UniProtKB/Swiss-Prot annotation:
Disulfide bonds: 64-92, 66-81, 71-91
Originating organism: Mus musculus
Cellular localisation: Secreted
Biological classification of the source: Eukaryota, Metazoa, Chordata, Craniata, Vertebrata
A GO CC term assigned to this protein in UniProt: extracellular space
Recorded superkingdom: Eukaryota
Protein name, UniProt field: Alpha-defensin 5
Function, in words: Probably contributes to the antimicrobial barrier function of the small bowel mucosa.
Amino acid sequence: MKTFVLLSALVLLAFQVQADPIHKTDEETNTEEQPGEEDQAVSISFGGQEGSALHEELSKKLICYCRIRGCKRRERVFGTCRNLFLTFVFCCS
């Protein structure tokens, strides 16, 4: 039983290392964007003064992580992440 618990903890730790952080794209970070099939270009256009303010707010870059337990204080849930048979919480700030 102790061996099973230890092996389970090691597997979860390995998944956490692979899943956290997934994607860092902020001016403050110096990591490169990872190219891949997940990259999608989205174009959003709004009209009027209210639309331009909304566009500025939406165009800010997010820092996202897959977390095991839940999001931290300043993060919000944006969905889920899957790695084999485990499901994580996708948190962005």
